[in-house]
Amino acid sequence: MAAMTPLDLTCHPASPAPVPLGVRVGLERSGSLLTLLWRVQADPASIVWPAPQPAGPADGLWQHTCFEAFIRRDDGSPSYTEFNFSPSGQWACYRFAAERERDSAPAAAQPHAPVLRFQPLIDGAQLVAQLTLPDPPDDDHPGWRIGLTAVVETAGGPLCWWALHHPAPRPDFHHPGGHVLRLPADRPLRSF
């Protein structure tokens, strides 16, 4: 299994964190199963963590602390899938035919429900999400390009927008220039 260092997300300069804060992501892929681990390092009291809710799909998760993955085929196609994972246990999945253009085709049905596990820590928290990739690998699969992001709500403060790469002057996780991580289809990968 190939190894990588966990990936540090950076806060967008237009939304600086008002408290000391760091966000890292690790990932592991085996077949069509992708496991993502977000680790927030901060004084736990300085972050607003959504209260537990029944597990299931929900909209508007990005309005509070949540973790996101944008996944597209690495073949130049404009279509992609957005996943949102909340510490509350709720999640969302949206498919797009192009940037911010929702896909209404029958094939855009919801995937299998992801499995989420949120764990408060003495110096922050972590969230693990296990999901089935929206486009399973086959012999001719080009692999994926992924944007890994986080929205962090600070206590008494604004939202901070974190990503592997910010290609625009304002936070925009849908921008294809932010989907910079290449995930090969021909071999497993582990970065935590």
Role assignments for model-derived ranges:
Residues G22, L33, H64-E68, Y80, ...:
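Extracellular structured ligand-interaction cores
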Residues D123-P137:
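Localized edge beta-strand/strand-to-loop motifs within extracellular or lumenal beta-rich domains
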